[in-house]
């Protein structure tokens, strides 16, 4: 029986307040309005940015349904939708692409002005929610809201992908993989034969390592305080692994000594202010490029010696790897299907959706790279 045009009752993980576990609830999801799409989520990844909301370091309105990395199937569409149809496999886009704003039209920008990133309103574009639970409206997250069996997104926040693609794998392209991989190949523009360092070897960091290898880097140095991650880092392309706790000097000095003055490209993937500065300082003077990939806490400021930049180093930031969602995500899925890069090594756990809190526990304990939840 078709559910188009009807309110759908389904399971979702609601975060009622920060520093509390997710609560599996029955929620109501209303039909999509004009230029909106309702999606049945098949698989969704657990991202550290979601946990930043739980612990309060990223501020967004609560109660909310989080989640922003997923793959699903279009259930129904609102009036005026032309780019997807019911039955299409899709990836929701937490960085939308309207194709009309100045940012979308610029070849080097991917931060569409219609996105919720940075504004954290917790609604769709009309300022309202499509979710209710126990008679109360529930906030969206980043315009995609994937910790729900069904979600509603704007048409500009979803893109069609290859019908043969395995959603439990390509869902990683919806955030983590693209964020790391693109930071190397698209934003940093890693050069063949260069020396790279990646601070933190989690899922995004490992994706950056994959990108550095794909770009032809000669040396890729993984930096992490968890030695258990080094085997996976080397499997995916790291040539050397360094634990800062093994040294009695700052890690940027260690990297400078290892590389005759500094690396050509560095990637900070944790989101810590001290490691952001350290990643810049480990770069070679005159030409080194450091890319900030990790999401920093709200309302904090960097302090550093401006001579570090005046000496010729460059500092860049990367959201979603610099990719334009509608243009680039289908291409990345096609590249995965063509075996141009792996996703399987990044997935350490596949859990049923009801085990979402167990998945977050593994993330916090550093015992998973990526946990994928399936409905």
Curated annotation (Swiss-Prot):
Keyword set includes Oxidoreductase: yes
Keywords: Acetylation, Cytoplasm, Metal-binding, NAD, Oxidoreductase, Zinc
Positions where N6-succinyllysine occurs in the chain: 234, 340
Binding residues for Zn(2+) 1: 47, 68, 175
Family annotation (InterPro entries): ADH-like_C, ADH-like_N, ADH_Zn_CS, GroES-like_sf, NAD(P)-bd_dom_sf, PKS_ER
Positions of post-translational N-acetylserine modification: 2
Keyword Flavoprotein on entry: no
Record localization: Cytoplasm
GO biological processes: retinoic acid metabolic process; retinol metabolic process
Top class in the EC scheme: oxidoreductase
Membrane-crossing residue ranges in chain numbering: none
Co-factor requirement: Zn(2+)
Leader peptide range in chain numbering: none
Known catalytic reactions: a primary alcohol + NAD(+) = an aldehyde + NADH + H(+); a secondary alcohol + NAD(+) = a ketone + NADH + H(+)
UniProt cofactor note: Binds 2 Zn(2+) ions per subunit.
EC number, UniProt record: 1.1.1.1
MF-aspect GO terms: all-trans-retinol dehydrogenase (NAD+) activity; zinc ion binding
Subunit structure: Homodimer.
Annotated NAD(+) binding sites: 200-205, 224, 229, 293-295, 370
Family indicated by similarity: Belongs to the zinc-containing alcohol dehydrogenase family. Class-I subfamily.
GO cellular component: cytosol
Positions of Zn(2+) 2 binding: 98, 101, 104, 112
Name this protein carries in UniProt: Alcohol dehydrogenase 1
Gene giving rise to this polypeptide: ADH1
């Amino acid at each position: 029986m078709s559910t188009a045009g009807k309110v759908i009752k389904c399971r979702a993980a609601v975060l009622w307040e920060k520093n509390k576990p997710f609560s599996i609830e029955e929620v109501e999801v209303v039909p999509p309005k004009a230029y909106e799409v309702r999606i049945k989520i098949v698989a969704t990844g657990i991202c550290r940015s979601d946990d930043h909301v739980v612990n309060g370091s990223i501020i967004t309105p609560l109660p909310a349904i989080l989640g922003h990395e997923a793959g699903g199937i279009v259930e129904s569409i609102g009036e005026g939708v032309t780019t997807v149809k019911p039955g299409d496999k899709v990836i929701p886009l937490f960085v939308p692409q309207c194709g009309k704003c100045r940012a979308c039209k610029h070849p080097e920008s991917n931060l569409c002005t219609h996105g919720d990133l940075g504004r954290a309103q917790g609604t769709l574009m009309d300022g309202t929610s499509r979710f209710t639970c126990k008679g109360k409206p529930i906030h969206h997250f980043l315009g995609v809201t994937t910790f729900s069996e069904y979600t509603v997104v704007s048409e500009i926040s979803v893109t069609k992908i290859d019908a043969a693609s395995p959603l439990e794998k390509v869902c990683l392209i919806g955030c983590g993989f693209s964020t790391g991989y693109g930071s190397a190949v698209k934003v940093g523009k890693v050069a063949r034969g260069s020396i790279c360092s990646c601070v933190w070897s989690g899922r995004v960091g490992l994706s950056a390592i994959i990108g550095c290898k794909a770009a032809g880097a000669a040396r890729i140095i993984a930096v992490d305080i968890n030695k258990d991650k080094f085997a996976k880092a080397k499997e995916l392309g790291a040539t050397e692994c360094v634990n800062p706790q093994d040294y009695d000097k700052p890690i940027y000095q260690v990297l400078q000594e290892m590389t005759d003055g500094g690396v050509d490209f560095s990637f900070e993937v944790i989101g810590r202010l001290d490691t952001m500065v350290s990643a810049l300082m480990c770069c070679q003077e005159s030409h080194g490029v450091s890319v900030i990939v990790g999401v920093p806490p709200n309302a904090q400021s960097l302090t550093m010696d401006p001579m570090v930049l005046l000496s010729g180093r460059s500092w860049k930031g990367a959201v979603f790897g610099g990719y334009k969602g509608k243009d680039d995500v289908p291409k990345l899925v096609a590249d995965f299907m063509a075996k141009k890069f792996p996703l399987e090594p990044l997935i350490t756990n596949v859990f049923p959706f009801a085990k979402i809190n167990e998945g977050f526990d593994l993330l916090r304990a550093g015992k998973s790279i990526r946990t994928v939840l399936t409905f």
